[in-house]
Amino acid sequence: MKLIAVGDNVVDYYQDQETFYPGGNALNVAVLAKRLGHESSYIGIVGNDEAAAHLLNVLKLEQVNADYIRQAHGENGMAIVTLDEQGDRIFVRSNKGGIQSRLRLAFQEKDVSFISGHDLLHTSVYSRLENDLPQLCGLVPVSFDFSTNREDDYLRRVCPYVTYAFFSGSDLSESECGELAKTAHGYGAKMVCMTRGGQGAILSAGDRVYHQPIVEADIIDTLGAGDSFIAGFLTAFCVKQDITYALRQAAETAAKTCGVYGAFGYGYPYRLEDGGSSEKTRIL
C-alpha cells in the first residue's frame, strides 16, 4: 500500500519545554503511515529556517519520500502550544502557516504522474487544496480531514471529491454525529468518521454505522492522536478492506501516539524570542 499526503506541515512549539516537534496533519499522516510499514510520500511547502531544516531531516530519517517537496525563502509554519493537566493540547498562537500562507502548491505534470503512482492521497482543511480536489480525486481516492469545519457550504464544496471524510467531533452528541454523516454522504463522501476524544469514534459507511471505543493508554500528550487514528485506519482498511479491523488498528495507533510528546517525537530545543502571547484556545 502506497500513501501520499499533500499539504500542511508545521512545527509545534511547546513553551514549557522550549522545544518544537514536527507536525501538521498531512505530514503526520505520511510519517505515521510509514511507521506502520507502508510506502509513504509527502508533498508540501516548507521554509528555509531552522524549523524547516528539522522537518526535512526528520522526513529523511523516517524514510518518507520528500522528493517533490517545495522549499521557499521564509519562515516555516509554527504553532505555539502548551498542555493542560490531562495532556490535552492548547494552542496559544501561530504564525498562520508561515510561508505556506503566502504560496500555494501548483501541480505540474511530473507531480501528477508521481501522485498517480500511489493508492491513496490524504490532505486536510489546513492545506488549501480545495480547488485541486477535482483533479486529485481523478488520480487516486482522496482522504480529507475537515477538523472542526462543518460549514454546509464547505461540505458541499469538498465532499463530492472525497472517499474518506474525517471530522473532529468531541463536542458532538451521537445524534449530531449522525446528522453530520448524513450531510457529508449526501454531498458525496463515501465513508464519514467522527473522532470524539475519550468517547472513541463513530464511522458511517452509508448503510451501516460503526462504533470504536478508545484503547486505554498512559497519556503524556494527545497532540497528533487524531492524525494517528487517520493513518491507522487508512492503511489498515486499504490492505484488509475490513472496517471493524481498521477502526481497531486506528484506535491502537492513536493510543501509542498519546505516549510520546508531539505527534511522533523528534523534539528540537529552541528558544522563541517573544515567548508567545497568553491567549489560549482549546482545540477539540
UniProtKB/Swiss-Prot annotation:
Function, in words: Catalyzes the phosphorylation of a range of fructosamines to fructosamine 6-phosphates.
Family statement: Belongs to the carbohydrate kinase PfkB family.
EC annotation from Swiss-Prot or TrEMBL: 2.7.1.-
Descriptive protein name: Fructosamine kinase FrlD
Annotated keywords: ATP-binding, Carbohydrate metabolism, Kinase, Nucleotide-binding, Transferase
Coiled-coil regions listed in the entry: none
Protein origin, superkingdom: Bacteria
Record PANTHER family: FRUCTOSELYSINE 6-KINASE, HEXOKINASE FAMILY MEMBER
Organism: Bacillus subtilis (strain 168)
InterPro entries given in the database record: Carboh/pur_kinase_PfkB_CS (IPR002173), PfkB_Carbo_kinase (IPR050306), PfkB_dom (IPR011611), Ribokinase-like (IPR029056)
GO molecular function: ATP binding; kinase activity
